Amino acid sequence: MKNLIKILSAIILLLFIAHPIKAEVISDDSARMLTFQPKISDNIRFAKKKLVMSRVLNRYDSPLLRSVDSFLSTCVLYELDCYLLPSIAGLESTFGKQVLYGSNNPFGWGNGLILFESWDQAIDTVGKGLKENYINKGAESVEQIGSIYATSKTWSSRITYFMNVFEKEEEKIDLILEQNQVNL
């Protein structure tokens, strides 16, 4: 009985304290049809780039496939286009398949004669070198980098070709994501 009196007292008290509100304001916002469009955060963007790199490197049967995380962390650290380094490796060594044995140098860095302990060390060293010796000195485009990096006049157009391979793969993934958009 005491519990019943306490419950009734609480209900009566709440009824007197409660403030009236306009239900149409609340229902107006809650009744709208929402389209779920996630804000592309850095994590999502880099997860997509990781997938793109993995798919392209897998297609070329590249030994660099296990170094996708190094490509990504290097592009973030040195503020590079994430597809630049793998594209250079694509041109210079067919994505790491044609290198001096044991050199771990897929970029042709130092005319391909510089030896690295690992692919990851090569990726970081070349990324840092591009940032410090090319980009920080005014070479901002692939063409400007190419005029310093390589003696071939077609180097930049061939790097651009490989960068486009990665970008087209990213477009395919974007299409898949758009087709699977959720409407609430």
Name each region found by the language model.
Residues 19-49, 167:
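An acidic, Gly/Ser/Thr/Pro-rich helix-cap/linker signature
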Residues 37, 41-57, 87-139:
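Peptidoglycan-targeting cell-wall enzymes and recognition modules
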Residues 69-94:
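Short, functionally critical alpha-helical segments immediately adjacent to catalytic or ligand/cofactor-binding
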Residues 2-28, 112-184:
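Non-catalytic cell-wall polysaccharide-engagement segments
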Residues 2, 17-20, 54-77:
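Hydrophobic, well-ordered secondary-structure segments
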Residues 81-83, 94-101, 150-158:
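Secretory-pathway/luminal and periplasmic proteins that interact with or process carbohydrate-rich
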